[in-house]
């Protein structure tokens, strides 16, 4: 591999150190040209060029002085002129009104086309938006011209035009029009803001405009953070890229292609990879020459379209970039210096403009920008298509019928008759649109075609839009629509239009019928105003007694008492308390129930309506509850409401008074374990209620509780007796012996007690409460109908406390509660029970409680007709208090006709109820008089402008109903255009009201919704994210074969490869094909639309190439292809936002992302499968394998996103300081990694000088002593390794080292056979100078005599500091 030295030309100069600082050299080529006098207005751009030229020509000092002078000049005149903006400076161009008028005319013409059903709703929307966009652009031009011609010294214009402040888009909003705005969903609103800020916005416009303003503010805030993080990741991935070599000597290069014959700045500062020759093979630019603007211009003049240049992408310098491949440092436009940290410069150059990018994602709602590539006829003549022309019908997004070319061909316009002259030739590319037919004669300046740039199929997605009816009437389809029922995977049936056609709505008065109404008139009958069209009746479900209520709102309630129950033997007594009214029920025998409900309320089944207030089960104090055998309760999930008694019995109650004190012990006025009388003061101001023995509970000198237990205390020392009882207590039945001399005639509760002075038993009395099996129910009087729900009361007894529960209380508690709950069977959920208070029949002073189940029927009031309902008349068929049976009619409602006309009923299937009917009125028709023969027949549909007879054209749309010799009757109608595949919501003959949905238009729009722009897109690219819904890529090159499935949705796609292998591709629903049958495709080409997955793209390139080329070449070429596409993708995003970044910066970053490969099979090398390693390293390893005859490693190239690449860098210090510190450091420790401190970051962290700039020279010396890339390769100069660390662990030994090098871990040595095999495999002679690597030391880690090499080699090692003197 030879590297030719750069030929010295006037354009490249080599500078020695410091030459730039001391003597600014004038470049000889430029020195000869005399200074030219430029007499023109200097704006921002010209100023930039001027300063740049001065810097290149005269160096820093002169340029700085000139810039200073320019600043002073500017300030001087700015001060004199005192430029500022006043309202009068904002001059609105006169042409504005005309332009807006023209736009409105175009839009009303579009609306008219829509009204006539010539275009769909989508096409109308697209056309309107495009019209406004175009108007806005024309208005900007008008603003520019107005200022230029009428007021060139206008302050606003000067500022915007010179680039001092502001730009045209801001001026446009100040004096032009604000234009179209997007709504919060990102869709463009088709109502533009026509005014500007000078004229002032209307309220509506202001609100619309504030959407965008808010979005802008939020956007800016988010952008700064995102941009900063992007810069940090970029710096981390590229921080170790430093210019370390003069020339890497590579023969690889990249090709730069001219765009429209121009290279722009893309060649500047790059070195040519080979001689550039012109058309006559003359040498234009020698190899390795830096291209300056003059040379770039010469190359363009010579019409050279491709130039091979050197690039960081193809640089073969190890872990760095060489000067030649990098080219100029753009700071001073000279070849980059050694030691320049180009990685960090690249990272900052890409990250810094991030704040200028937008984050917005636009959903334009199917909007295509202004038509591009429109070709007009230059002459009049006859159109001729060439023989190979293939075209098909196409409808443009604006609804214009055109043709689309399927192949490339030539279209000629041939002059006819007297017009002799040259024919006009137009090259039509496939996908272009044609607006003329073959053989058609046309005039000059007619739009002939719209040419697309090559056969680029745009990525499209399906979107939908509703078609809303704006006229009530009957639906009719055009025959061409051919609706077809389609069943989807879920089994839902939808009706779809197969062809483009019209859906008509014919006018008429549509009546909505109530749910249970049925028509009483047949189809085709004439009706007058007030005729009954339909009747609806309401009937009772259960029957009962009718109550008529006062009307509420626009309906009247009829109540039917189905079941009622009166509590005749209870008085209803009302009490007033401060919290409101309380109602009690009192029986004759004095039992009182507290009502939980009040009259007038509604209750449901099972609800508790009253509680019995029973003093018999109330205690005087707290105590202990015990259930006697026989008493049982139902198990309940929660004990919140108590325990329901399932079987009655005896409840035992042991009284016990408990005072909760929580005061200081000093306040205690009695002694523990002493008997006290009722009324004793136990603590200051607290008195006992009962007599008994006191127990005091205290903690930390705080008095917690005082318990007073009733009963008598008997001293006893008999262990046997005491052991029969516990401190918790035992129940003793009457007659059972306790102690001598104690006669128990009733149940006692006995507890063992130990006082400080003596021991004994406390005998406590037990109270007994008898609980019945069933609670006593009040006597009721209830009604049971023959049909209807039953109503009754049920009493429930609930115990408040569970068995063994201790209630700590001074006041008494309620042990048993009796609840009254309502019980009703056969009641439907919507039937509620009403609570009423009624007077007693015999005594009006007494009120009784009455419970009734009501069936409530709302009867509609009579209504006057409105747009969707006819007038109704409702009649009640029952009287108050009348008894009705189940199924009796309560009311009938009649729907009356509003106007005279002809009734039509819709077609219904089976017994489907009729919900609408239509009356065709006189005003829905028009009679058109004709004098000659009619050209239409009954049933024809005509639109505005269609001929009815030879002399008369229709001025309306509709359907012909009658044709006679003198007149034609037309029924008004409204056509709606529906596109193929639209979903139809209505059937032929259906009746619709205004506002109903007729169809859902399915249309294709360019995928703009998902075109993520700006920063998120840059991030997506640099992080190599896998996009959602990615395109399907061709795995290997071949010929496409497309087969149509049974239903129109399913398409099978396969590619026939070289060896006749057929590769089938699974197509997902909604994916559009980007290829046609029989087309030749290459590996990596997208077969369907959608964003490209970069990882998959790399795999496809690699798999396609590795069958044709050696593994290494395939990897290099596939990586190179991916690199080029990534650089151009990133550039496109920045360019679209008007940000210029030099390619080389992006190339440095992309190089870092694509530098690694994944080992698939290690062969005989010491690499590990799955390991990520640099391609260069693998290349060297495989070369060594080729020499030794071992099996090479197999690998696949990988693409790493910037975050992943940063974490996979060779330096673990750099990776750990970036992200996931613990994981990175742990892994590095386990693997025993070494960090060579190559990058800037590692050195900064450790606190050394960084190996860039002035610190670079020291680093070069260090590098020269450093080991090569991998143990399997022998370094060239010394014939072997000198550092033990660089070796693989399986043959590493400890070895004396110079202090500069850290010692690595000692690992187990392989057995002698292994050692021998390793030596043989690598062709290594044990006596070579890297003997330490492959020799085996003895136990003391010393080498034996025969292991040591000859003294000369030893001396060499000692000199290098690798062996100590011993």
Curated annotation (Swiss-Prot):
It comes from the Bacteria. It catalyses: RNA(n) + a ribonucleoside 5'-triphosphate = RNA(n+1) + diphosphate. Its cofactor is Zn(2+). Keywords: DNA-directed RNA polymerase, Metal-binding, Nucleotidyltransferase, Transcription, Transferase, Zinc. GO terms for biological process: DNA-templated transcription. Its EC number is 2.7.7.6. It is an enzyme of class 2 (transferase). Residues 1354-1366 have a biased composition (Low complexity). One of its GO terms (molecular function) is zinc ion binding. Binds 1 Zn(2+) ion per subunit. Zn(2+) binds at residues 248, 315, 322, 325. In cyanobacteria the RNAP catalytic core is composed of 2 alpha, 1 beta, 1 beta', 1 gamma and 1 omega subunit. When a sigma factor is associated with the core the holoenzyme is formed, which can initiate transcription. DNA-dependent RNA polymerase catalyzes the transcription of DNA into RNA using the four ribonucleoside triphosphates as substrates. This is DNA-directed RNA polymerase subunit beta'. It comes from Prochlorococcus marinus (strain AS9601).
